Amino acid sequence: MLDVNFFDELRIGLATADDIRQWSYGEVKKPETINYRTLKPEKDGLFCEKIFGPTRDWECYCGKYKRVRFKGIICERCGVEVTRAKVRRERMGHIELAAPVTHIWYFKGVPSRLGYLLDLAPKDLEKIIYFAAYVITSVDEELRHNELSTLEAEMEVEKKAVADQRDADLEARAQKLEADLAELEAEGAKSDVRRKVKDGGEREMRQIRDRAQRELDRLDEIWNTFTKLAPKQLIVDEVLYRELTDRYGEYFTGAMGAESIQKLMENFDIDAEAESLRETIRTGKGQKKLRALKRLKVVAAFQANGNSPMGMVLDAVPVIPPELRPMVQLDGGRFATSDLNDLYRRVINRNNRLKRLIDLGAPEIIVNNEKRMLQESVDALFDNGRRGRPVTGPGNRPLKSLSDLLKGKQGRFRQNLLGKRVDYSGRSVIVVGPQLKLHQCGLPKLMALELFKPFVMKRLVDLNHAQNIKSAKRMVERQRPQVWDVLEEVIAEHPVLLNRAPTLHRLGIQAFEPQLVEGKAIQLHPLVCEAFNADFDGDQMAVHLPLSAEAQAEARILMLSSNNILSPASGRPLAMPRLDMVTGLYYLTRLEEGAKGEYRPATADAPEFGVYSSPAEAQMAVDRGELTVRSKIKVRLTDQRPPKDVEAELFPEGWQRGDAWTTETTLGRVLFNELLPADYPFINEPMPKKRQATIINDLAERYPMIVVAQTVDKLKDAGFYWATRSGVTVSMSDVLVPPEKAEIMERYEAQSDQIEKKYQRGALDHQERNNALVKIWQEATEEVGKALRAHYPADNPIITIVDSGATGNFTQTRTLAGMKGLVTNPKGEFIPRPIKSSFREGLTVLEYFINTHGARKGLADTALRTADSGYLTRRLVDVSQDVIVREHDCGTERGIVVPIAEKQPDGSIIRDPHVETSTYARTLAADAVDANGNVIVAKGADLGDPALEALLEAGITEVKVRSVLTCTTGTGVCATCYGRSMATGKLVDIGEAVGIVAAQSIGEPGTQLTMRTFHQGGVAGDDITGGLPRVQELFEARVPKGKAPIAEVSGRVRLEDDDRFYKITIIPDDGGEEVVYDKLSKRQRLRVFKHDDGTERLLSDGDHVEVGQQLLEGAADPHEVLRVMGPRQVQVHLVHEVQEVYRSQGVSIHDKHIEVIVRQMLRRVTIIDSGSTEFLPGSLTERAEFEAANRRVVAEGGEPASGRPVLMGITKASLATDSWLSAASFQETTRVLTDAAINCRSDKLIGLKENVIIGKLIPAGTGINRYRNIQVQPTEEARAAAYAVPSYDDTYYSPDSFGSSTGAAVPLDDYGFSDYR
């Protein structure tokens, strides 16, 4: 077998009959499979051992040679080679066809490649191939021309003979008629008898004339057809064809079926054809030119790569190895067989019958029919169902052909090449493990024993617990006591991977250090649940074991959960306290007024009370019951850093550990601050979830990961501890219904009655009434909510849970205790009947029924959304999978300008709300300079939180940053343009697969995006697409529904308004031609935008618009934006529009991820004029290739090609990728492979998918060449240590530890990797 690491590209082409015979180990002559009595393969059949190899290792068919010592001998009795049985997986056979057949992919695919090559319409081609018409393959023009006059004379003679014969017949008949009439007259017959005889005679004369005329016409037709006869001409009339061959057989040849196609191809001059097509393109117009372009694509493909078009017509069919189409015996003696065997059998049967018919010299019509059936059976083998009805097996099920084995989710590509099952893995239910550290997981003993079995066995032998591996295996299987100690030893320091399906982003697989636990459930650390999206209601997770040293190192350094605290999408921490932990910490840091032992300042008659010299003293008071953790106290602190303002006041030189200061706080807050790093400023406020998030964020920004990991672990422990002691529970008695509710409802009932009355009187129409009712009940619901809020005490558990941010929101509380309010029907419109009850009071039957609408729609939506979102992710991954960080800096000067703040009229600055997702974590492309010209942040700096704060303080409103969109790296991107990796908070590493990270970051929140298209408060307008469909629409670059026109020029607007449509005319500033937008529907409203005076109002007559500005509400068509504004603007437009959707759902994704995808959509150029280059006009080509070709041509003094940037949807862009392996495994497998084979495409194996398919290491991360090819030169000490002979009393045999032996996160910040760059 060939090793995948020894080739750099994979080429696909057309196989000729010789290739097929060369691969083959013998011809399959019989349709038999195996002998049903002996169960041995039949000789010369589809499973023949002579052709495909022996079924048993080192054993021939007849049993003469058995044993490995006869290796390579070919048995002289049965002809079987003595070798391994696994050759039956790789040896092919072939079937020699008695008549050539065409390959259905090239004839039937759209467009028909065979049709384009031969310039035949697919309909005609079908007639020829399936024996419904003859085609002229060649004409001897010269001979015909030379002998034309002779032939014409002969024809004239023949015609004259016919005419003479006719005249003679007529004459004879006329004479007979005259004689008959004379006779009748003599007999004195009646006149009607005479008339009858006369009519009869005339009728016969007419028939003679007609017959002669028909014969003359036929001769004319034969002559005309012959004189105009040309190759590739179809003759459907069989009689005509036979006449032609009888008369003029030596002047032309014709045939039907695939043979004729083969003959046409033999005479086909590719170079001449290509030249004439190029000429047509240069001079032609319209349809003719288009057709020539399409044909040239196919012709040029054959011309360029020396592929022979003869490969599209087969003389021999390959037979794939028998192990790939197995036949197995089921219990009960029946056989299950692969469909391919049935298809092959049909081909062989028909082929053998055809051979016999030809030998017998059967009539042509019978032979042709058999040839047609052979053609059909080969079609079914290659692609069943592509033409006509598919061949069905038992139970009317279409048989799976070779094409079906490659296609779709169950096909070879997606099922076996892109996803394989692996060993050293297991799965089990997960339960929570609150005692674990962040980098640990609990692994059930039995599971660990099975996973680590080989390691345990080896160790048992090393320690002499067992004599050999076999007995060690027995020990493990019987679970002897010493096995467990060995298992503990083996497991230490060996990380395992945990994965929860669906793996929507890269945090769906993380590494942990296993801790052995009793039971059969995997224990999971509570903080990683968010990343896995796991809960403990029966979820299962899979465990995988990294085996090699490299795999373990990668797992420990890159995948350990404590190194993956930040989200790769937004760079914000994912491992942060939730639910109970939040409640506990919130409880701990709340201040309770009037609690026991609270601080009282000194008065005239009493000293101050509740002052403590240290937190320890306060803790003693709590233990004695004199104080609670939530009472306000005054305490002296020495181990905790004061807040910034206090520090500046008390310790101008800076606080040192041990410096004392006092503050008014609660003991709970002091305890909370003890969980944070010692030099973190003291925080004296309650801690809801939002606040906790900002703290962890800040820690991630300013401290090493190892500290963050330890801190969140401490927060988790404290959170659970105090949640238990807070006594937060929910009971019916906590759900308080506000007493004012009845009065509020009465007031609004009255208002709604009024509306009803007006409606009854006819003062309002249906729509107005509904709108009014909706408005009234929305107000009522709000008012009940306010009353509810006021009515709840602060220590109510439900309010505590909501306020702390643990879970739930106020709307849910209102639903429980206040009123549910208005609900929507499945179309998304409000039902004007409110639900007046709360769940605490219980709903009426009607209310319950109305409520089920929305609830049920929610469930249906979620199910649909999950599938849609998964498919979107798949397309995104496919389009961006080869975007890998390839170099450190591409050196470009370009960048994009992003706003970071907005100047207010009073001169103050408001921070832009989207800085987090647009500017943060990028590299500056130019110095950021303030109003006085001072450089605040230098070019090339990384914009973290501190840098952004500095910019805002200096009053800078926008900065120029590097972006993926402007990166000039040929394949992939450079690290500087990409900026910081969101997941590590440092500049992205070379080899990082940023394309896949981007796809996952966009796809993972897809499920949260809403499905429905929004109605504007029940207004019957054009729906505005929102949510997931809008994201798909943008990435697929579709023309949006209800698209809004954009201004093509800057100028003044003239707005004309009739009853149904708007007409907008723009008068350009530069005095060019006016631009008119006609028939704009009134249902799309005019767009609101800022005018020169700073006010916002609708577009109106006389306004001034800038180029590219939207004129109506709705979405602009990205293709128009590209045409009017150019590629840069359309990129910005797409990024902004996608972000709009995600932001509206509160999802935070960094712009750079969307930019990576958008960059892939704009990578190609359509060639308008090819100049002196090789490009074909109208073809798509990579921008980099296009520019390189132009530079080359210009350097040689030629004419460069001109092109237009084109925006491709992600599906189209994936299919247009350079890698045919990647495209074929994505969609439309057969079409991609057909094209690739004709073009003789070569896959350079640059992206990830191609390498996964052929089984190489992917060229990303540590698989990239610069890391694969490192060689380490050991230092003298290292060499001495490596080659030392250890003695037994050395520490050599004590378990060596990596880092401290806690196995905590590796402090990567302490290692410099700069030498490897």
UniProtKB/Swiss-Prot annotation:
Catalytic activities: RNA(n) + a ribonucleoside 5'-triphosphate = RNA(n+1) + diphosphate
Binding site for Zn(2+) 2: C890, C967, C974, C977
Single biological process term from Gene Ontology: DNA-templated transcription
EC number: 2.7.7.6
Residues at which Zn(2+) 1 binds: C60, C62, C75, C78
Oligomer and partners: The RNAP catalytic core consists of 2 alpha, 1 beta, 1 beta' and 1 omega subunit. When a sigma factor is associated with the core the holoenzyme is formed, which can initiate transcription.
Annotated Gene3D superfamilies: 1.10.132.30, 1.10.150.390, 1.10.1790.20, 1.10.40.90, 2.40.40.20, 2.40.50.100, RNA polymerase II, clamp domain, RNA polymerase Rpb1, domain 3
Cofactor(s) needed: Mg(2+); Zn(2+)
Family indicated by similarity: Belongs to the RNA polymerase beta' chain family.
UniProt GO MF annotations: DNA binding; DNA-directed RNA polymerase activity; magnesium ion binding; zinc ion binding
Keyword Methyltransferase: no
Official protein name in the record: DNA-directed RNA polymerase subunit beta'
Cited NCBIfam families: PRK14906.1 (NF011498), rpoC_TIGR (TIGR02386)
Cofactor, free-text remark: Binds 1 Mg(2+) ion per subunit. Binds 2 Zn(2+) ions per subunit.
Pfam families, sorted: RNA_pol_Rpb1_1, RNA_pol_Rpb1_2, RNA_pol_Rpb1_3, RNA_pol_Rpb1_4, RNA_pol_Rpb1_5
Keywords (A to Z) from UniProt: DNA-directed RNA polymerase, Magnesium, Metal-binding, Nucleotidyltransferase, Transcription, Transferase, Zinc
Residues annotated to bind Mg(2+): D535, D537, D539
Function of the protein: DNA-dependent RNA polymerase catalyzes the transcription of DNA into RNA using the four ribonucleoside triphosphates as substrates.
GO CC terms: DNA-directed RNA polymerase complex
